[in-house]
Amino acid sequence: MEEVEKALKEGTILSLLNFFPVEDGENYFIPSGTIHAIGKGVTVIEIQQNSNLTYRLYDYNRIGNDGKPRELHIQKALKVIDTKAYHPISFQEPLIGECKYFSSSVHNVKGIPMIQANKESFISITFLTGEGSVNSIPYKALDTFFIPAGKEAVLNGSGTFVLTTVNR
């Protein structure tokens, strides 16, 4: 942990990070507490358990809307950081991520014309590609829909989507 704190003070934190080149369609399951960043030009769907906390360790010296550097949360973050080396976790598709809080899987719209949310929790649908409608509401790539607990969604169109369910 001292190495992380020293690198933060010296402005060399990037030297401690592992960089993973990414390609379209890849997914990475990153457990909470893992230091991570999203590179320039990369679009992600970040699915996580409900939390009101995000600790910023480094912010590339960006300026906030108020004209001042954005707030960092170094001491709080140091208490929860997992410094073990990150190794990508593989899942057997359609599953692309799973933890005690949620499960995410990727599907083709043509293969699943209707989705039913269970009575305990909502489901989330994020479209990666294609266009069409969910319950007659149009969608395009990167649109997200939340289906309330106990309700259903009728899908029409084309493309792929990520389906996320809450684990109980």
State each model region's role:
Residues 1-4, 108-136, 141:
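Glycine- and acidic-residue-biased ligand/ion/polar-headgroup-sensing regions
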Residues 8-18, 27-29, 35-83:
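An exposed, glycine/acidic-rich loop-and-rim segment of catalytic or binding clefts
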Residues 16, 24, 32, 41, ...:
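A generic structural signal for well-ordered coil/turn residues at beta-strand boundaries
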Residues 17-29, 133-153:
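Short acidic-glycine-tyrosine-enriched beta hairpin
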Residues 33-53, 138-140, 149-168:
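Ligand-binding loop in jelly-roll beta-barrel domains
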Residues 54-122:
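C-terminal amphipathic alpha-helical segment
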Residues 98-101, 116-120, 126, 138-140, ...:
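A structural signal for short secondary-structure junctions
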